[in-house]
Amino acid sequence: MAKTDIARRVYNHAWKLDPIIRSLIDTDFYKLLMLQMIWKLYPDVNASFTLINRTKRVHLAEEIDEGELREQLDHARTLRLSKKEMIWLAGNSFYGRAQIFEPEFLAWLSNFQLPEYELSKKDGQYVLDFHGAWKETTMWEIPALAIVNELRSRSAMKALGPFTLDVLYARAKAKMWSKVERLRELPGLRISDFGTRRRHSFLWQRWCVEALKEGIGPAFTGTSNVLLAMDSDLEAVGTNAHELPMVAAALAQTDEQLRNAPYKILRDWNKLYGGNLLIVLPDAFGTAAFLRDAPEWVADWTGFRPDSAPPIEGGEKIIDWWKKMGRDPRQKLLIFSDGLDVDAIIDTYRHFEGRVRMSFGWGTNLTNDFAGCAPTEISGLNPISVVCKVSDANGRPAVKLSDNPQKATGEPAEVERYLKFFGTEDRVDQTVLV
């Protein structure tokens, strides 16, 4: 892969449009896995997605030019899968399985285009919504977030000269490499890049992936970014996300259907996927509620991804549940991925070493950590907590509770209804940084 002088590239914006999204597969792998399931099992469901900036002190509409945002969103809508990308998706093995994507699905995907968007401003924030068929709107989540985050980075660096940019990226590279060196202390580490959605930029994410590949070798197990996996000859990694149980719950007509929504999604998932893709994401409506009501067959799945509780605390609860269900945790897998940086990775690894199989998904603090790297403080280079979540399904409001109330999304009245239904056990407020 050709090396890019990122500082020079950032400074030299002589072209009309520097695309942030270069390909429809510049997205997370689990979006494609989920898309196939949605296409196959939920083809007629409509779902809306909404951009949510949880870092309220940052007014995105004041930092990002609306014209530039529209240009990037419009450009993303022009993209189609290339012949090379189609061949790679059809011919490659993922998670040890050939032809994980059905030919009929790929034929449909070959003509895929991102649907239209709605953009406005309110109270210094952008209101960005995507309405339509779930099998279309779901694919906006990652590119929308990547566009917003990179435009914010570009805006913060607009006034910087070439020398300052050179210093900025030199320091960021040194900071990143020092993290890589610390990870070498963990002999059985398995870690992958989960940093697409809130990355500083595509080029910076690519450099971070190359650094991990070079620095920790086989301990680096792949990237969630499908384009980077293809271009760098890496494994594409990822399982499933909260949107699946959120939509199933929104569609529920009875209390029984609402209670069973997370498990219905797992059954649906297992119709298409197996093995190391059988990873449970338990916290959409609170991990305690999920474990309390879970059928015994859930304990036979490969592992869990505790996503909003503190990693050690969340991992211990799942290990206790496995033991209660008569399963040996040493044969199970925990994937930690919530807001991790190198200290948390090391602490979590050492805490659970020998007790359970572990893997780590390293996200924003891998691909967007520029704190202290600029010669003067530039607040626009600090990452923010911005997400793009399902807001409704077939016109019915969607809710995510999470183990951290700060991460809850949905209409307040609906959130309250879900809390009364699923309970508030083990939900603990934690500051959300990314």
UniProtKB/Swiss-Prot annotation:
InterPro entries: N/Namide_PRibTrfase, NAPRTase_N, Nic_PRibTrfase, Nic_PRibTrfase-Fam, Nicotinate_pribotase-like_C. The keyword Lipid metabolism does not apply. Pathway: Cofactor biosynthesis; NAD(+) biosynthesis; nicotinate D-ribonucleotide from nicotinate: step 1/1. The modification Phosphohistidine is found at H242. GO terms for molecular function: nicotinate phosphoribosyltransferase activity. Its EC number is 6.3.4.21. One of its GO terms (biological process) is NAD biosynthetic process via the salvage pathway. It catalyses: nicotinate + 5-phospho-alpha-D-ribose 1-diphosphate + ATP + H2O = nicotinate beta-D-ribonucleotide + ADP + phosphate + diphosphate. Keywords: Ligase, Phosphoprotein, Pyridine nucleotide biosynthesis. One of its GO terms (cellular component) is cytosol. Pfam families: NAPRTase (PF04095), NAPRTase_N (PF17767). Transiently phosphorylated on a His residue during the reaction cycle. Phosphorylation strongly increases the affinity for substrates and increases the rate of nicotinate D-ribonucleotide production. Dephosphorylation regenerates the low-affinity form of the enzyme, leading to product release. Catalyzes the synthesis of beta-nicotinate D-ribonucleotide from nicotinate and 5-phospho-D-ribose 1-phosphate at the expense of ATP. PANTHER family: NICOTINATE PHOSPHORIBOSYLTRANSFERASE. Belongs to the NAPRTase family. This is Nicotinate phosphoribosyltransferase. It comes from Rhizobium etli (strain CIAT 652). The gene is pncB.
